[in-house]
Regions:
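Outer-membrane beta-barrel porins/channels
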Residues: 19-21, 132-133, 137-143, 147-478
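N-terminal, post-signal peptide beta-strand-biased segments of exported outer-membrane/organellar beta-barrel
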Residues: 16-170
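Bacterial Sec-dependent N-terminal signal peptides
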Residues: 1-23, 394
Length: 478
């Protein structure tokens, strides 16, 4: 068995584009994946690659466990703050609370500045390949993505809550126990006991669609079960070979939020969140036909399910030049648990104190729940398309130790939604194997939801290909 099995262990990657290579650490540090990845790591990228030999041709099986990648990008926060808040979110810890002045600064920093986060976890992957049969693989992968961008008003309301300038009047509790209405003056509010402020009131309220103009909140968490097959279709000596592959995927949905507005009364806004998040929707829950409060003891209870397909085709020329094309995530998910549509109502007042720190994940209830900005109508279900992408890539082998290539990834959704890219991605990179047991990777990437980056990676190949372990970064600069 040792000579026929490749096992991938102890895998991790940092600052990565999760959807580019899913949780495959061996592809993370390269900047390109469409024609590079093999075995189960090709799932979700290009199923035609399953027709190729495994990386070590004498192996017939490949298996991997506990592979993960994550990325965070923000124009408003330092890299250290991003790392600290991400670690707090993973550990389900609450960070230190803002002072009033820190809230004011946070609102300024996040105005028009995007925040993107991706986390991908591959719990298990398996692949089998022979020349006669081709290649078949199965993989379980969790994909979590967050993207947000706020205009000035929304940024102030989210961080300052009832003291945001939009609310021009404040109801305060006096020492005598009486209440009084005062003007919301920043210089005066900073000196008040914040606990004495009951709520903020807008005397000239706006509809949420207008107030949210140009802002976006997108969240997606899905668990993907992917079964794919690929093989060689045509071969003409060592000059030309054609490969094709197909994959079918079953999705479980844990969370979905899509809130956008163009300011002209056209607002796309709905959410479906597992009961594990503990969001209180107030009175809207009682009338919601999809209300679900059941809690599972271990994993979050899913609130959506659907199917998708991947298609891929490769051309191999002279056993050196690879050209690949793939279309991934053709399908949809139907969300049928805790489904809510946001009503376009006037925003009169709020009792919210605003976000207490940058750990947004731990405060989703404050944003989406009954104390947040939104009012809801319950829905029985809603079906949304998967974030379909078209991938094109090519690579060339220079001897047995060097392979160089590029990738182009094009989102096809007309309007970017949860789990999708804001713009196309272009990447260049390659692998160098100076020693039989060491592989170095590097590249250059731009586009998607991130700035230009320089990925690097280091992989150790042990036991003549029986084991791989490594680490990679999507951006060596940050």
């Amino acid at each position: 068995m040792k000579n026929n099995l490749l096992i991938v262990l102890a895998l991790s990657s940092f600052n990565v584009f999760g959807q580019i290579e899913n949780s495959s650490f061996t592809a993370t540090g390269r900047g390109a994946a469409t024609t590079f990845v093999t075995d189960y790591q090709a799932l979700g990228i290009n199923p035609a690659n399953l027709g190729w030999h495994l990386e070590f041709e004498e192996k017939k099986f490949a298996m991997g466990f506990n592979e993960f990648t994550y990325s965070i990008h923000s124009g408003a926060l330092s890299k250290q703050t991003l790392r600290d808040e991400f670690k707090s979110a993973i550990r389900q810890e609450e960070g230190a609370s803002f002072t009033y002045d820190e809230k004011v600064q946070a609102a300024k920093d996040f105005s028009e500045a995007g925040l993107a986060l991706n986390f991908n976890y591959g719990s298990f992957g398996f692949a089998y390949h022979t020349d006669k049969f081709g290649g078949i693989a199965f993989r379980v992968n969790d994909n979590v993505s967050w993207y947000s961008k706020f205009n000035e008003d929304i940024s102030e309301i989210l961080f300052l809550g009832k003291t945001a300038p939009y609310f021009d009047s404040l109801m305060v509790l006096l020492p005598s126990g009486d209440t009084s209405m005062i003007l919301n003056d920043t210089s005066m509010v900073s000196g008040l006991n914040q606990d004495s402020i009951i709520n903020g009131i807008a005397t000239l309220p706006s509809n949420i669609s207008k107030l949210f103009d140009g802002s976006q909140i997108s969240l997606s968490w899905t668990r993907e079960y992917n079964l794919s097959y690929g093989r060689k279709i045509i071969e003409k000596d060592s000059v030309f070979a054609l490969y094709a592959g197909v994959g079918i995927k079953y999705f479980q949905g844990m969370a979905y939020v899509d809130i956008t507005s163009n300011g002209d009364g056209e607002m796309e806004a709905f959410s479906s969140m597992s009961s594990a998040f503990g969001i209180n929707y107030g009175d809207a829950a009682a009338l919601n036909p999809s209300n679900d409060t059941i809690l599972n003891s271990l994993l979050p209870r899913s609130v959506g399910q659907g199917f998708g397909m991947d298609f891929g085709v490769n051309i191999l020329l002279f056993n050196k030049l690879k050209i690949g094309l793939a279309v991934n995530n053709i399908g949809s998910i139907t969300w049928d648990g805790n489904v809510y549509a946001v009503k376009d109502t006037l925003v009169f007042d709020t009792e919210s104190s605003g976000l207490e720190n940058f750990n947004v994940a731990s405060q989703l209830g404050d944003i989406l729940g009954e104390d947040g900005l939104f009012e809801y109508n319950g829905l029985a279900s809603k079906t949304v398309k998967l974030p379909t992408v078209v991938r094109f890539g090519a690579s060339i082998e220079l001897g047995k130790k060097i392979e160089l290539g590029f990738d182009m990834i094009l989102p096809t959704n007309e309007v970017p939604g949860p789990g999708s890219y804001q713009k196309a991605i272009i990447g260049f990179g390659g692998d160098v194997q100076p020693l039989p047991w060491v592989r170095l990777s590097a590249g250059l990437m731009t586009g998607g939801n991130y700035d230009t980056s320089i990925p690097i990676g280091l992989t150790f190949v042990l036991g003549k290909g029986s084991f791989e372990a490594g680490i990679a970064s999507r951006d060596a600069i940050t």
